[in-house]
């Protein structure tokens, strides 16, 4: 039967976000008013999905911080008022970065409740999420190796040029001042 977006998140997470131990960390940022309903649904469904996909879920919740709320606007883009008081709405996806900063993870996949798909359409999503994660982890590993080399203070001019090429070609970071290093 039809599944809720929360259930689709659990299914998708099992397909590409399980660690070597089979643990899938899933974090939901929800409104305070709906948090208990989400928790109840997780209690009802997580075991079923864990069994189906052979994983263990670590599911956490946070609430979008009110400090990231924005003023609601009417059709004329004027501040919307409810009985004379300005109405504030959740600030949107960008505001969730503050919640993500509170998580301790090397890789975080962000998925909106509006763009989950049923299993028959997940193949491309799973393939590309795995690909993106692989590229990210490879780049991260190389960056950390270069940082260790820089911290050691023991590197050659050739290694410095290699690091510069990595920054420019792999991370797309260019700084006009690096021209002096290239000469």
Where are these regions (language model features)?
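Domain-scale recognition of functional cores that engage charged ligands
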Residues: 1-183
């Amino acid at each position: 039967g039809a599944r809720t977006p929360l259930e689709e998140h659990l299914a998708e997470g099992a397909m590409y976000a399980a660690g070597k131990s089979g643990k899938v960390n899933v974090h939901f940022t929800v409104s305070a008013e709906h948090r208990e309903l989400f928790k109840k649904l997780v209690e009802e469904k997580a075991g079923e999905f864990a069994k189906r996909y052979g994983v263990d879920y670590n599911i956490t919740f946070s609430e979008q911080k009110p400090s990231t709320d924005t003023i609601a606007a009417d059709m004329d883009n004027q501040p919307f008022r409810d009985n004379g008081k300005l109405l504030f709405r959740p600030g949107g996806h960008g505001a969730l970065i503050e919640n993500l900063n509170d998580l301790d993870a090397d890789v975080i996949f962000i998925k909106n409740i509006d763009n989950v798909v049923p299993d028959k359409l997940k193949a491309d999503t799973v393939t590309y999420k795995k690909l993106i994660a692989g590229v990210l982890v490879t780049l991260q590993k190389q960056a950390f190796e270069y940082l260790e080399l820089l911290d050691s203070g023991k590197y050659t001019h050739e290694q410095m040029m290699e690091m510069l090429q990595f920054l420019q070609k792999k991370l797309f970071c260019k700084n006009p001042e690096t021209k002096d290093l290239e000469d």
